[in-house]
Amino acid sequence: MKMEAMYEQLGVSRAVYEYGEEVLASLRPRFDAIDQTAEYNQAKVLAAMQKNRVNAAHFAATTGYGYDDEGRDNLERVYADVFHTEAALVRPQITCGTHALTVALSANLLPGDELLSPVGAPYDTLEEVIGIRESKCSLKEYGVTYAQADLKPDGTFDYDAIRAAINERTKLITIQRSKGYATRPSFSVDQIGALIRFCKEIKPDVKVMVDNCYGEFVERMEPSDMGADMVVGSLIKNPGGGLAPIGGYICGTKECVERCAYRLSAPGLGQEVGANLGLMPAFYQGLFLSPTVVSGALKGAVFAANIYEKLGFACVPNATESRHDIIQAVTLGSREAMVAFCKGIQAAAPVDSYVTPEPWAMPGYDSDVIMAAGAFVQGSSIELSADGPIREPYAVYFQGGLTWYHAKLGILMSLQKLVEAGIVTL
């Protein structure tokens, strides 16, 4: 059976397949560069595992308190070496990226302190954590204030506004690397490094936390290489490699990570407790595979931008820009187009491919959200997925794909559904 016939069997018409192949022919140099980054990061992860003498004993399950859990403790040493930090907290008890960020913020901010975002509004779910939208147990309720310096219209840092916002109460600065549900560019590690240096020149004792979600292993360097006191993320995104079924990480200075451990468990207990529940093989192997998995997701994002920009849709990043996370935003312009796109992603899934995604009132968001994710791990965004809030400018956010070939199929299926809906003509 020819390749185009196999795609037709999966629901992709010959016209859509041929359009995709035409676009793909021009992307070989981009894909080669992505592979080189993956090779570098694979070596970095392997070196950390070899340095810490990972062996079969580290895969043993623990229960209860988890005292003397050498597999867990060694994994945290591996993460600290991968991210070039003094310490790391890597736990299945951290349920998601928002949870990891909440632990990091609440552990390192006290009543009377101020949190500053120099990159505009935070991701939707953090609005309630901070207290921008009212919620019980928010930082605001505990007496932590919040300040924000918006980006310039071109998406660059407003250094004058940032300088004016930093004051004697500014204790912690939070930088969101990825665009989230916005259409601004994601920030490169170099850009984040320049911002960190600027902030610390004004207030040397200020702590900087980087929300690293969706950005791990996209570049050769991480924000922790550029002076961040903490980098924070989710194991069901990039660093879990699609194998971790739950978890989050915080890598940073010994002081910051120690405080995070006390906040996650209890004062006096810290990192000494927290059973691994048999998840160590998935955590170690997922980290090992992560550079390769991320490279496939990046190829999918580049392919999507080139597919949709050619059809007249605005894409962030655009078809030729460099990549700093795995997310591809495509502004589709209507609710109907968003739904059609997500139906295509869902139809390409290995799990729940027969399900039709519809917008719904998702907890933590102030508008209906549509999500397509036929994933092995619920909510995993390193697996092929697409989502977005049903609001202007009706942008859908595509990410993931455990393999490049699956990402490719998902993008072609999204286009197929737009063609079938009469929204796109090839």
Functional labels for PLM-detected ranges:
Residues 38-42:
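Acidic, PIN/NYN-like endoribonuclease modules and their adjacent C-terminal/linker elements
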